[in-house]
């Protein structure tokens, strides 16, 4: 039910600006709903989420609005002159733990945050895109996390098989099955 409301809100905002990545935002709506409403339940200062697929930031903003971390007016000003919220998350804004945008950089930041927070037993959650798995820096972070025994990282890959020019499975068939890559 919440996911449906989130999608309606995304569409409502998309009528006013052209900078929304609808496909990527819609495909991770349920993922974001579960992370923010079942795992990040409290407002603990050290609870941490990184939207590695930064182009889908609008869903994060809408959830932060629902949680009264962002104001409705701030979300209404998404990608508008005078607004604080852009297409990609900026850690200078309330509820945003890392500035992301260029695919492939988010998981490295997650590894750094996890290392810093391991002693405090704080978990770092992140959503990656399947297209982002084409980036070498993502795989460096994927290998670094277990090497440093960072058991306080939860990564969810939005495996929607979509990217800018063609299906992810067509451009990089070696990625599939993705689940197997995380077990090797």
Model-found features: residue ranges?
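Short, surface-exposed acidic-centric catalytic microdomains
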Residues: 165-169
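Conserved thiamine diphosphate
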Residues: 122, 170-184
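N-terminal capping segment at the start of a domain
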Residues: 3-19, 158
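Cofactor-binding active-site loop characterized by glycine-rich and histidine/acidic residues
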Residues: 26-147
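Active-site flanking loop/helix segments enriched in acidic
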Residues: 12-22, 91-97
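Short gly/pro/ser/thr-enriched loop/turn and capping motifs at secondary-structure boundaries
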Residues: 134, 161-164
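N-terminal glycine-rich anion-binding loops that anchor highly charged ligand groups
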Residues: 5, 23, 27
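Short internal beta-strands
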Residues: 50-52, 152-159
């Amino acid at each position: 039910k919440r996911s449906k409301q989130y999608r309606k809100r995304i569409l409502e905002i998309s009528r006013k600006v052209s900078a929304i990545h609808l496909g990527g935002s819609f495909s991770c709506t349920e993922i974001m709903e579960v992370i923010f409403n079942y795992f990040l339940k409290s407002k603990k200062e050290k609870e941490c989420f990184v939207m590695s697929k930064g182009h889908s930031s609008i869903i994060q903003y809408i959830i932060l609005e629902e949680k009264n971390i962002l104001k409705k007016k701030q979300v209404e000003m998404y990608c508008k002159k005078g607004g604080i919220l852009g297409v990609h998350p900026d850690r200078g804004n309330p509820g945003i733990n890392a500035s992301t945008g260029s695919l492939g950089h988010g998981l490295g930041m997650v590894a750094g945050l996890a290392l810093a927070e391991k002693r405090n037993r704080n978990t770092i959650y992140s959503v990656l895109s399947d297209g982002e798995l084409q980036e070498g820096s993502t795989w460096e972070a994927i290998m670094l996390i277990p090497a440093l025994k960072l058991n306080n990282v939860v990564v969810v890959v939005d495996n929607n098989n979509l990217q800018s020019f063609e299906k992810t499975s067509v451009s990089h068939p070696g990625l599939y099955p993705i689940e197997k890559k995380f077990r090797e």
